Regions:
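Catalytic domains of riboflavin
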Residues: 1-295
């Protein structure tokens, strides 16, 4: 059953089984953005038949969306010059590629499926690819759709959520007259080809339930006024920004005191730690109790 009754739109949980089986999904972004639908298939499931369907029935640019880490491992640079990325929505076009072996001209559905398989294979490096090639690559932002609500990030996120490699193949859907298909067109298209629609906005809402902070380091910090603290360093998965928590004694539910991040200057940081500890520590017989905790 669809999320919105008898329409072709579905929730994330409903499309993940399709993604795992290699079925296509139509990814639709916000109306105030591109307002377009892209055919999507997980890169691990990108067969020659899937690529041919995209070419015949999608009609747009067939692209391989990869994580930042993967594009670095493959030596793929962004296609920009000193003027920077001038695309309207910041699409990160990277070097187009062909597989070095097992392809002809690189353009056929078989060749592009082969190039995709090589690009996402474990152990593949820059030497296994020819550049420039016929398959366009895209670099997704770390953080996925929580960092950028684009088809590129949605493709990577959806493949990862399905338990597959974080890479997806996308192709814009165009109408027969060459115009871009909008939601009314996409709903008819989805019913005709029996493909489910997923709004990127729903993927954003789904991902907001994930844990976005992880602990990266722990050490001790001696202070002249309050003794020794445990110093815990956490990192925000979206902005890779560090936060520091100072802990002394048993941690109980408390309110949180926030300070601006000043960890880039160790001298300034140390001075602020000492002054702030004085403000938040109350003296008890033979002990200090922290409350509330400080986070930088």
């Amino acid at each position: 059953m669809s999320r919105t009754g008898k329409t072709s739109e579905f929730a994330v949980e409903q499309v993940l089984p399709d993604v795992r089986r290699g079925r296509m999904v139509i990814l639709v972004d916000d109306e105030d953005r591109e307002n377009e639908g892209d055919l999507f298939v997980a890169a691990e499931r990108a067969t020659p038949e899937a690529i041919n369907f995209m070419a015949v029935h999608g009609r747009g640019l067939i692209s391989l969306a990869l994580t930042e880490e993967r594009t670095r491992a493959l030596g793929l640079s962004l296609i920009t010059d000193d003027t920077g990325n001038q695309t309207k929505f910041g699409t990160a076009f990277a070097t187009p590629i062909d597989a070095r072996e097992g392809v002809g001209s690189g353009m056929s559905a078989h060749d592009r499926a082969r190039t995709i398989a090589v690009a996402i294979a474990d152990g593949t490096g820059p030497a296994d690819l020819i550049r420039p090639g016929r398959l366009q690559t895209l670099r997704a932002l770390d953080g996925g759709v929580l960092a950028r609500r684009g088809h590129t990030e949605a493709a990577v996120d959806l493949a990862r959520l399905a338990g597959l490699k974080a890479a997806g193949v996308i192709c814009e859907i165009m109408k027969e007259d060459g115009a871009m298909a909008r939601m009314p067109d996409l709903k008819r298209y989805a019913r005709r080809h029996d493909i489910r629609i997923l709004r990127i906005a729903d993927l954003v809402a789904y991902r907001r339930n994930e844990r976005q902070v992880r602990r990266r380091a722990e050490t001790t910090l001696p202070t002249s006024k309050a003794g020794e603290f445990r110093l815990l360093v956490y990192e925000d998965n979206l902005e890779t920004q560090a936060f520091v928590a100072m802990v002394k004694g048993e941690v109980k539910p408390l309110s949180i005191r926030w300070r601006s991040n000043e960890t880039s200057n160790p001298t300034r940081f140390s001075r602020n730690v000492c002054s702030s500890v004085t403000l938040c520590v109350s003296h008890q017989p033979n002990s200090y109790l922290v409350g509330p905790p400080i986070i930088w």
